[in-house]
Amino acid sequence: MAAARPFLKMHGAGNDFVVLDARAHPLDLAPAAAARIADRHRGVGCDQIILIERDDGAAAFMRILNADGSESGACGNATRCVAALLAGETGARRLTIRTNAGLLPAEIKGPTLVEVDMGAPKLGWEDIPLAEPADTLSLRLALGPVQNPAACSMGNPHATFFVDDLTHLQIETIGPKLEHARLFPERANIGFARIDAPDRIRLRVWERGAGLTLACGSGACAALVNAHRRGLAARRAEIEMDGGTLTLTWRDDGHVLMEGPVALVFEGELDAAMLAP
């Protein structure tokens, strides 16, 4: 049985994480253990579990496990949190973190403010991926009051529905059905965006493997990209989510920059039973 391990509870704009440092002592966390830790009633509770691992070509490798135990390629809010931790160790203002989605450069902007270069979105249907060829600017997909989302990949698949009313939208009902739609062979993160101004977007996200979260960094990136592609938003906008606001910039070179807050909530220890497969 695995030994007890220290952890940090962190969040970025309310998107919360259990962070485990596995650089000195590697940890092979089974999906069942990840789901146990993420349980908000019987575990610590979080949207994702983050494992910080050694990497010879970057400051660290960041492994991301969703609340259901599945693995994710990218998480912008978690990247900011890990960047802040690593910068605190070394004093570096700029560093690069490797994820399954690639290398993500980060810059410390303030004591609790971090910017991450999330890379360039992938817009081809096969890159998201979709189950069949389709125009990713307007998918033939509808459920209840929402229809025809735009899709892209920010290291993980995203579909963004543009709506006029977020208040009465039953996201807990339609979110899981859209996540598992046949069009998305790897499932998808589902965003619901209301355009308040060309530089202001209100967003709620049903995250693949995590459900409705207070914030989703890659979802915010996808919302800006898809809104700009539709002619609904500028290349720079404030993305307001339930847990806070992120500042997004889609640069002319194609890269998306995401700036937002990070916070350390508390420290603790996971016992061996919690870590067991």
Curated annotation (Swiss-Prot):
GO terms for molecular function: diaminopimelate epimerase activity. Its EC number is 5.1.1.7. GO terms for biological process: lysine biosynthetic process via diaminopimelate. It catalyses: (2S,6S)-2,6-diaminopimelate = meso-2,6-diaminopimelate. PROSITE patterns: DAP_EPIMERASE. It is an enzyme of class 5 (isomerase). One of its GO terms (cellular component) is cytosol. PANTHER family: DIAMINOPIMELATE EPIMERASE, DIAMINOPIMELATE EPIMERASE, CHLOROPLASTIC. Belongs to the diaminopimelate epimerase family. Homodimer. This is Diaminopimelate epimerase. The lineage of its organism: Bacteria, Pseudomonadati, Pseudomonadota, Alphaproteobacteria, Acetobacterales. The gene is dapF.
